[in-house]
Structure formats: structure tokens, C-alpha cells
């Protein structure tokens, strides 16, 4: 028997609200008698906009305050972009569902027709060290400019800050109906996505069977297995959301292929590898690939990034 009321916690950005409203709509379609409400919560990542995320430090910059509201009993579930979700959870909370992945690619918003057409020394805006490292590896001549803010703000900075391009997640642009601004989608082999990019995660109190049963239908098995492998790699590397680590899993015929990357921020040092195996071994495969990357130079790269031993 589903609950009569379900309270969803979400960030207040336009993209976060789109995601939460999509979950709300799906719940209302499945349970017409259920009252579903949204609670907007401002996180530390939303409040600190004048500092690059990598310098803010800590994990869970976009989820901590939402989890605290759940622990206080103010909300029942939280909807997150999977790429923002830490690999560890407060006691009693957990990720119960991972939704079917939207387009996992990075997208170029620019005046040029393609990334390869950007002029020498072009100014490219991004908030992610992962993107910065991979793009500089391909084009060392580029000037990377750190930009913060929601999707619309970042696109606006293309003009306001005299940038030649900004790089954003394709999933967010598609969800917000902004695909007309995309000059090119970057192949996942060229720009490996962030861990969990394109998927949504639904977090809840694991001790609440009424809620967990009501939301179980959101889970997409193939996406869940792929993202669990990506997150196992990240966890093994002891990485947060703002480190130059990338991974992308795909599943065909019960077989998981996982590509992973650890790179120096300037793109000069670059360790990439891949692994394949049975989908039911997804987390083991992620850990094994992480060990390979770390042993082939990734550990030294991360030590320099963190300025401490991992």
C-alpha cells in the first residue's frame, strides 16, 4: 500500500526542479491518490558560487543539506543528479533507485561548428576538472575558464565573459529543452563522462519499507549496474565529485564494459583503461579497473591533486 503523501526534497535550480517534477509526475501517474509535494533546499554548492568547486573541498556539496532534512523527517525522498552523489551515505540513508540514463555525453555550446574548429588559444568555460583535463589533453592550446552557476547562467557566460565555448552535460540541456544551443556532442570515448552522468538517483530512509516499495519502479537495472560500477571505481580511488576521475559503463547482452580515466588537471598525465565482465560483477569490475588505473600512475596524479596521500 503506497503512502498517502510523499515529500520530495530537491535543490532549487531549474534543472533540479525539472528532475524532481518528473519524479513527482511519474509517482502521480502510478498512484493517482497520492499527494506529492516538493521541498526546495539550498545546499552549500548552491550558496558558494564565487569559488571553483574543487577549492570548496569536501564531498556532498549538493546533497548534504537535503540529507539532513531527510534525517530530521522533513522529507521522504530526495532526487539527485547521480554525478553529484557521494559514494558514502549518512547512517540510515541510501540510494534506492537509479533511473534510466539520459544522454551521458558532454556537449559543446559555442559559436564554432565543432570542438575541433575552435581557434588556437580559445577560451573554454567548464566547472569540471574531469572535462578540463580531457580537453587539454586533446588541445593543450586551450585556455580553460572556471565557470559556476546553473545551466542558463553558464550559457549566458559564453557572451558575458567573452568565451569561445562552454562544455555542459548533454542530459541537462535536453531536459531543459536547450538542445538548439548545442554545436556538438562529444563522443564518450573522447570525453569520458562524470561518474553517473545522465542518471538520476532517488535517496530515502532505508528503514521505511512503505516508501521504498512505492519508488522501486524507478530503478532501471542496466543503468543501475553501469552506475554502480562507475561509483565503485570512484570509491576505490577515494575520489569526490570534483576530481579529474571519469568512468562510463555500458551493458550489452549481460556484459558490462567499463572505461575509466585518471588525469592531471593540465591533461599532460593521462591514465586510461577499460575492463569487461559479467554485469552481476559490476562493483568488482569497477574496483579492479580502479586498481589498474592507480597502479599505472593514477595514484601519483591524485596525490598531486589532493596534495596529500590517498
Swiss-Prot record:
Which molecular function term from Gene Ontology is one that the record holds? hydroxymethylbilane synthase activity
Q: In which pathway does it act?
A: Porphyrin-containing compound metabolism; protoporphyrin-IX biosynthesis; coproporphyrinogen-III from 5-aminolevulinate: step 2/4
Listed under GO biological process in this entry are: protoporphyrinogen IX biosynthetic process
Does this entry carry the keyword DNA damage? no
Quote the cofactor binding remark. Binds 1 dipyrromethane group covalently.
Query: Which enzyme class, named as a word?
Result: transferase
Query: Where is the PTM S-(dipyrrolylmethanemethyl)cysteine found along the chain?
Result: 241
Record Pfam families: Porphobil_deam, Porphobil_deamC
A GO CC term assigned to this protein in UniProt? cytoplasm
The lineage's top-level taxon is Bacteria
Its recorded reaction(s) are: 4 porphobilinogen + H2O = hydroxymethylbilane + 4 NH4(+)
InterPro entries according to UniProt: HemC, Porphobilin_deaminase_cofac_BS, Porphobilin_deaminase_N, Porphobilinogen_deaminase_C, Porphobilinogen_deaminase_C_sf
| Cofactor(s) annotated in UniProt | dipyrromethane
Keywords assigned by UniProt? Porphyrin biosynthesis, Transferase
Stated EC number for the protein is 2.5.1.61
Its annotated function is as follows: Tetrapolymerization of the monopyrrole PBG into the hydroxymethylbilane pre-uroporphyrinogen in several discrete steps.
- NCBIfam families recorded for this chain? hemC
Assembly and interaction partners: Monomer.
Any extra detail in the entry?
Answer: The porphobilinogen subunits are added to the dipyrromethane group.
Protein family (similarity comment): Belongs to the HMBS family.
Please state what the protein is called.
Porphobilinogen deaminase
Amino acid at each position: 500500500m503506497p503512502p498517502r503523501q510523499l515529500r520530495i526534497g530537491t535543490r532549487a535550480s531549474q534543472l533540479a526542479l525539472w528532475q524532481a517534477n518528473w519524479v513527482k509526475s511519474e509517482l502521480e501517474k502510478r498512484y493517482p491518490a497520492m499527494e506529492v509535494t516538493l521541498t526546495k533546499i539550498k545546499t552549500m554548492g548552491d550558496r558558494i558560487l564565487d569559488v571553483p568547486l574543487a577549492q570548496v573541498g569536501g564531498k556532498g556539496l549538493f546533497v548534504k543539506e537535503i540529507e539532513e532534512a531527510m534525517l530530521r523527517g522533513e522529507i521522504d525522498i530526495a532526487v539527485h543528479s547521480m554525478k553529484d552523489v557521494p559514494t558514502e551515505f549518512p547512517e540510515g540513508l541510501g540510494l534506492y533507485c537509479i533511473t534510466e540514463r539520459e544522454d551521458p555525453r558532454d556537449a559543446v555550446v559555442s559559436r564554432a561548428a565543432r570542438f575541433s574548429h575552435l581557434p588556437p588559444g580559445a577560451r573554454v568555460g567548464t566547472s569540471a576538472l574531469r572535462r578540463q583535463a580531457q580537453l587539454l589533453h586533446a588541445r593543450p592550446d586551450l585556455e580553460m575558464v572556471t565557470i559556476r552557476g546553473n545551466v542558463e547562467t553558464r550559457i549566458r557566460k559564453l557572451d558575458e565573459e567573452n568565451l569561445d565555448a562552454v562544455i555542459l552535460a548533454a542530459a541537462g540541456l535536453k531536459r531543459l529543452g536547450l538542445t538548439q544551443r548545442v554545436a556538438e556532442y562529444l563522443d564518450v570515448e573522447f570525453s569520458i563522462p562524470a561518474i553517473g552522468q545522465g542518471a538520476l538517483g532517488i535517496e530515502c530512509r532505508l528503514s521505511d519499507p512503505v516508501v521504498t516499495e512505492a519508488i522501486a519502479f524507478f530503478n532501471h537495472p542496466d543503468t543501475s549496474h553501469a552506475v554502480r560500477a562507475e561509483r565503485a571505481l570512484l570509491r576505490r580511488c577515494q575520489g569526490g565529485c570534483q576530481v579529474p576521475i571519469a568512468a562510463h559503463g555500458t551493458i550489452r547482452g549481460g556484459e558490462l564494459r567499463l572505461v575509466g580515466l585518471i588525469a592531471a588537471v593540465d591533461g599532460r598525465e593521462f591514465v586510461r583503461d577499460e575492463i569487461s565482465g559479467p554485469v552481476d560483477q559490476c562493483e568488482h569490475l569497477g574496483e579492479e579497473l580502479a586498481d589498474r588505473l592507480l597502479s599505472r600512475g593514477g595514484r601519483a596524479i591524485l596525490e598531486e591533486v589532493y596534495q596529500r596521500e590517498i
